[in-house]
């Protein structure tokens, strides 16, 4: 019988070791708090709970790709001063999945695919990558990374807020981003946001099908 497929979720902080010891310690505390919040919010989708490993890397194991998009953008929204590389791998496990397990305790093809995708993303200066999925999923991730790389810091912040809170009204987005509502509208026009939404919708459809 075929082994069930899982999705290993790896989120690595860019250039974390360049921070001062004090700043890095504060970052690690924030990451631990974020992992706890993800465990609460995505409990129904977790095969193994999110935890911090390798100092500044967050790992989680999902039962399907369904929460990946939301989880990735929750990270970016909650820690806007942090640059993330997020990589996901689809596949089975080779270690036993026991009750209460944390993601870093486990191993298997899904983790190997995620690690290879993460390494490739870092080498190519990408921020989103996938392994073990249909090739078009990683193709969309490349489009995503290229678009993200061309935006200003303010545009990235707005994109992360809108992707993490797709139903938020203009005033709520303005609060999350820290600008006036009129600035939100201006940034959307500059980003041609309606086309970004179209691309994002297609990306999410191929990711979860």
Where are these regions (language model features)?
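Regulatory and interdomain segments flanking nucleotide-handling catalytic cores
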Residues: 1-209
